[in-house]
Design a protein with these regions (language model features):
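Extended glycan-interaction surfaces of carbohydrate-active proteins
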Residues: 9-50, 89-173, 206-230, 247, ...
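Short, contiguous, pocket-lining structural segments
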Residues: 45-59, 76-79, 83, 116, ...
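Alpha-helical scaffold segments in carbohydrate-active enzymes
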Residues: 1-8, 56, 63-66, 79-97, ...
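Beta-rich accessory regions
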Residues: 67-82, 86-94, 98, 185-196, ...
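Well-ordered alpha-helical scaffold segments within catalytic/enzyme domains
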Residues: 3, 53-74, 123-134, 178-191, ...
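Active-site-proximal binding-pocket segments
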Residues: 171-178, 188-197, 205-213
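Acidic, turn-prone loop/beta-hairpin segments
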Residues: 157, 216-219, 223-228, 261-279
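Catalytic cores of secreted or luminal carbohydrate-active enzymes
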Residues: 234-278
């Protein structure tokens, strides 16, 4: 992907991404051989353009555009921004299913939309590729009972003929994926839904020794089984899964560092079980700091910088793309905590 982005003589960027000519058949995040299925349960043949891959391609172009601009490559930056805008328009045209009010899982080799309801769409919240007018429908669908188990969002809807609560990618719940979706919910301003998913993950962690989440768990709901069930070969500890809870914590506290400017944006959203949280040894650039976040008797959240060993400005601001956050709320967020 990096080679596509940074070839000085390349005249145009690819649009919808499918797959590399080498490697596994399924080259989205769900890379097992049976992970991408049509509505009737048949496996989709390669090449496949999964929805989440387009979102990460979109985000990569935007971030590389910023880098190009900073490095003085202004023409290249504008090309990347234009390509990102075009990709977002094409994605929302080709992947949106107006009947289901949801995005499809993928485009098959004939560019037909695979209208299977999966967790993959949640990644598109995090990357920002979803059109604003579709956000509420997408969030409601992700948290519907056939996808949201009560422990997390399933990889596949329970309504699908291929659903198996103990499969690797066809019904299980992945904590690392749910952390990504949690980040996307908060990024887009869905605070109540962010808390709902985060608290489900906390309850899930309590089932395991040392609150260590396994690689993946089953898709059983609490009213079906007292636990979500265990995927037979789930690893614990597991590398990428170890990032799940740190990302959830970052999401709930709204931490967004701008290290080069010695700035840390915060916007704490505390669950009912968290009256206060302290972070110690937080690095932002060359500065190490400690912060306290708490909720007062009126259910308002506050932040205090406890200590720092270098320059750092802590500023409260909601996520830049949050739906429904107007100028008034952003200005009020700048007022000091009492």
């Amino acid at each position: 992907m990096g080679q596509h982005l940074w070839r000085p003589r390349q005249r145009r960027l690819p649009g919808i991404l499918t797959r590399s000519p080498v490697g596994t058949k399924n080259q989205g995040w769900k890379d097992s051989g049976d992970a991408i299925v049509y509505e009737d349960g048949r496996a989709v043949p390669a090449p496949i353009a999964t929805c989440e891959l387009q979102g990460y391609w979109y985000a990569a172009q935007q971030l590389m555009a910023v880098l190009a601009w900073v490095l003085g490559e202004r023409r290249r930056a504008r090309e990347l921004w234009r390509a990102a805008r075009a990709l977002k328009q094409r994605f929302n045209r080709d992947f949106w299913d107006p009947e289901e009010r949801f995005y499809g899982l993928a485009l098959d080799p004939d560019k037909r939309l695979v209208c299977t309801a999966t967790s993959n769409v949640g990644h598109c919240l995090a990357s920002g590729i979803i059109a604003r007018e579709h956000l509420r429908d997408v969030v409601a669908r992700l948290l519907a009972p056939d996808l949201f188990s009560g422990w997390g969002i399933r990889t596949l809807t329970t309504r699908h003929p291929a659903y198996n609560p103990l499969s690797y990618h066809l019904g299980s719940v992945w904590p690392v994926e749910n952390a990504t979706i949690c980040f996307g919910l908060r990024r887009m301003g869905f605070d109540a839904e962010t808390l709902r998913l985060a608290e489900a993950l906390f309850r899930l962690a309590e089932l395991y020794a040392d609150d260590r989440l396994p690689e993946t768990v089953g898709g059983y709901a609490p009213d079906e089984h007292p636990t979500p069930g265990a995927y037979p070969r789930s690893n614990s500890p597991q590398t990428w899964n170890a990032s799940a809870m740190p990302l959830v914590l970052q999401t709930l506290l709204g931490l967004m560092p701008y290290a080069a400017r010695h700035v840390l944006l915060v916007d704490p959203l505390l669950p009912s079980s968290w009256p206060a949280v302290e972070l110690h040894g937080l690095r932002v650039g060359g500065t190490t700091a400690s912060l306290r976040f708490w909720r007062d008797e009126n259910d308002r959240t506050h932040t205090r910088l406890l200590e720092k060993d270098g320059p750092l400005h802590v500023i409260r601001q909601p996520p830049p793309e949050a739906v429904g956050v107007g100028l008034g709320r952003r200005l009020r967020a700048l007022l000091p905590s009492k």
